[in-house]
């Protein structure tokens, strides 16, 4: 986890064949990132384009000084100016909120519990659970705890990730003022044909603004992203609040 945290920008950008661009290469994208970064009072990150028709975007990097924002060719084709600004605001918010660090800490915590659970599981099998009758009850309890604890840790890790997505959505609206535009962008990305979904790797799916690996029902407990419908609903409420506060001010 520490290795992936330190070298995440290089690893993920290479994984998706992202190409760093300059303002001359793609003025629209570069200037949008520049504008939002200035509004957030952050250093300018690397700006990259992923050669994929699947509409998606992500931010990576261990801190604001070593960050990168990448968007796919497909995203640039289907979003208008305001929607693009809303999406970039979401990614800049992840950088501002230090979500790579928080995600690394959560993953490390879950990994440590998984290791301890494995040790306890083998201890229960070869120790208490396999010993005398009066030890079997305690050994069985230890075995159950060893199985449940890592599962609970992963669920908590995913819940933290979902909350960070909500926070990044809200921060994007605060930075850019584009609550409605981000909501319509999420709707467009969600409705993209299945054939256009980005070939996501599970290890990096949590970085994307739209996770095509998310599940439904009980499997949603293991999803890194909240349901799109709930994200849009929250953005619409925040937009209404911003209007009311504007009138009240």
Feature roles, as predicted:
Residues 1-140, 152-249:
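Polar-ligand-bearing catalytic/cofactor-coordination segments
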Residues 142, 146-147:
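Hydrophobic alpha-helical transmembrane segments of integral membrane proteins
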């Amino acid at each position: 986890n520490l290795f992936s945290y330190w070298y995440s920008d290089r690893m993920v950008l290479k994984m998706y064949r992202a190409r760093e661009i300059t303002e001359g290469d793609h003025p629209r994208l570069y200037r949008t990132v520049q504008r939002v970064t200035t509004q957030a009072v952050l250093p300018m990150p690397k700006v990259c384009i992923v050669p994929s028709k699947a509409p998606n975007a992500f931010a990576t990097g261990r801190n604001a000084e070593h960050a990168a924002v990448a968007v796919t060719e497909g995203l640039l084709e289907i979003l208008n100016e305001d929607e693009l600004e809303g999406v970039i605001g979401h990614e800049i918010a992840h950088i501002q909120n230090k979500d790579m660090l928080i995600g690394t800490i959560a993953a490390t915590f879950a990994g440590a519990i998984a290791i301890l659970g494995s040790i306890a599981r083998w201890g229960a099998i070869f120790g208490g659970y396999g010993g005398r009758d009066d030890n079997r009850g305690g050994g069985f309890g230890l075995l159950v705890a060893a199985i449940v604890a890592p599962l609970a840790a992963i669920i908590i890790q995913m819940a933290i990730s979902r909350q960070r997505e909500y926070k990044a959505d809200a921060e994007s609206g605060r930075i850019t003022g584009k609550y409605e535009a981000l909501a319509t962008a999420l709707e467009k990305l969600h409705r993209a044909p299945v054939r256009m979904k980005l070939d996501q790797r599970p290890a990096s799916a949590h970085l994307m603004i739209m996770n095509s690996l998310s599940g439904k029902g009980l499997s949603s407990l293991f999803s890194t992203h909240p349901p799109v419908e709930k994200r849009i609903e929250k953005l619409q409420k925040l937009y209404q609040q911003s209007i009311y506060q504007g009138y009240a001010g």
